[in-house]
């Protein structure tokens, strides 16, 4: 009977492993085939599929001053939005968990609200504010970061909420405060290191959303990366496709880097736990 059960378990594990491989391959093909097709088009010299291929369009990316300016502005917007979002959300969410737990549902509703509002409706609300800012302060494209912080709130809130839910914020804070730590020390040296993976996830989501945003920038008459790609596609489709592929590869590299950093931190934490879990007197 035991032999039959063991054989059944091995067969089930083999089937599950094969199913995972099939799903992984299907997902890889689903994402990679369009990207490879875009890359092939961006390296094609003529209009025929059998035409010669080179990197002419890729080399022309930096020959477009408007495109370079749009890329620079989008990267700056992504950085500003990520930092502003973290500075706004992390202390607020920690404080609500510690001092105002009854406010958690209200905060969640406010943060998730932009997800239910179409982007074009947000533009209608943003337009008077940006018109006033342009007339009285500045119409620099970096002011879009105010709108983008609101836009990324739902996604970043969920990522940070999952990270804070995985640790005992109250116990860690009380322990640090009882040892004389200031609130800044509690936040910077106790809470943030324990939710570093969640912070990286939120930052990545913020960067990906800002780099891919089109509607708000277009309707507020700003020229970010996606707006410039759309305009460039009317004049030079090869360069616009090359830029689109490059932006996708950039997001992919960020994702892989995030996974690598998160894996390394988990391994270091496991080693630390094992080190302190060994009985005293035994060699390490």
Regions found by a protein language model. Name each.
Residues 2-4, 26-65, 218, 272-273, ...:
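Short membrane-interfacial helix/loop motifs at transmembrane-helix boundaries
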Residues 140-177, 185-191:
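Membrane-cytosol interface at the C-terminal ends of specific transmembrane alpha-helices
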Residues 22-31, 150, 157-162, 183-212:
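Transmembrane alpha-helices
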Residues 8-13, 58-66, 211-269, 281-284:
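Interhelical loop and adjacent transmembrane-helix boundary motif
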Residues 11-15, 43-83, 234-235:
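Periplasmic/extracellular loop-to-transmembrane helix junction in inner-membrane transport proteins
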Residues 55-56, 103-104, 120-150, 184, ...:
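Membrane-interfacial helix termini and adjacent extracytoplasmic/periplasmic loops
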Residues 20-24, 69-73, 129-155, 196-198:
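Loop-to-helix entry region at the N-terminal start of transmembrane alpha-helices
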Residues 7-12, 80-111, 124, 128-132, ...:
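Transmembrane-helix boundary motif in ABC transporter permease subunits
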């Amino acid at each position: 009977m035991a032999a039959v059960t063991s054989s059944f378990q091995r067969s089930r594990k083999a089937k599950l492993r094969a199913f995972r491989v099939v799903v992984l391959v299907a997902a890889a093909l689903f994402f990679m085939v369009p990207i490879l097709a875009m890359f092939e088009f961006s390296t094609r010299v003529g209009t025929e599929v059998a035409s010669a291929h080179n990197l002419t369009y890729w080399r022309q990316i930096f020959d477009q001053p408007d495109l370079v300016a749009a890329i620079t502005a989008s990267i700056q917007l992504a950085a500003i939005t990520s930092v502003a979002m973290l500075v706004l959300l992390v202390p607020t969410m920690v404080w609500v968990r510690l001092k105002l737990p009854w406010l958690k549902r209200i905060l969640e509703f406010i943060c998730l609200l932009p997800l239910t509002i179409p982007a074009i409706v947000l533009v209608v609300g943003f337009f008077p504010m940006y018109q006033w800012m342009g007339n009285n302060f500045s119409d620099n494209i970096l002011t879009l970061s105010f709108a983008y912080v609101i836009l990324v709130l739902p996604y970043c809130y969920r990522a940070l909420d999952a990270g804070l839910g995985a640790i005992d914020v109250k116990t860690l804070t009380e322990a640090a405060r009882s040892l004389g730590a200031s609130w800044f020390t509690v936040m910077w040296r106790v809470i943030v290191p324990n939710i570093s993976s969640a912070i990286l996830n939120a930052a990545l989501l913020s960067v990906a959303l800002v780099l891919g945003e089109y509607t708000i920038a277009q309707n507020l008459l700003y020229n970010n990366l996606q707006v410039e790609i759309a305009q460039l596609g009317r004049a030079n489709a090869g360069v616009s496709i090359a830029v689109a592929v490059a932006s996708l590869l950039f997001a992919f590299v960020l994702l892989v880097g995030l996974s690598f950093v998160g894996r390394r931190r988990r391994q270091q934490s496991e080693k630390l736990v094992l080190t302190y879990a060994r009985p005293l007197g035994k060699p390490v």
